[in-house]
């Protein structure tokens, strides 16, 4: 069963056609990769699917109730924030649903168990893992 249907997507930047009449579908359980040379619309397509950007033409259709988790190429960070505060941003840290304990468990798996460490002290790879944790904690049906 298709969970994402991309139908006739086109995107123009200035006078350059980045995506032209692109159609494809993603079935439940699929893991896909998009490859190509620079400037061919890979990131643009993903941003359109994630709702971060609008297509000039076409549409994206999702199965009912599907949620999207988006981790862009350059996530934004509050460099003074702790790792735990960053991944729980927008959530009550100590809520009745165990969000903080879920966050700590996932951060430990991702080898970021120093929860009070400031984001500014992390390496690039550690920052990417923190951003991934933040997205995964939302329990999206689809991760982009």
Identify the residue ranges that each predicted region occupies:
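ABC ATP-binding cassette signature C-motif
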Residues: 1-144
């Amino acid at each position: 069963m298709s969970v994402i249907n991309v139908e006739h997507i086109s995107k123009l930047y200035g006078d350059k056609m980045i995506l032209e009449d692109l159609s494809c579908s993603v079935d439940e359980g699929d893991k896909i990769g998009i490859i190509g040379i620079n400037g061919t619309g890979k990131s643009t397509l993903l941003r359109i699917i994630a709702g971060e950007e609008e297509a000039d033409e076409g549409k994206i259709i999702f199965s009912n109730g599907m949620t999207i988790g988006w981790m862009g190429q350059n996530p934004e960070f509050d460099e003074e924030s702790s790792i735990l505060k960053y991944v729980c941003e927008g959530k009550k840290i100590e809520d009745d649903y165990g969000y903080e304990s879920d966050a700590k468990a996932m951060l430990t798996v991702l080898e970021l168990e120093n929860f009070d460490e400031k984001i500014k002290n992390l390496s690039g790879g550690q920052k990417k893992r923190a951003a991934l944790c933040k997205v995964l904690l939302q329990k999206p049906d689809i991760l982009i």
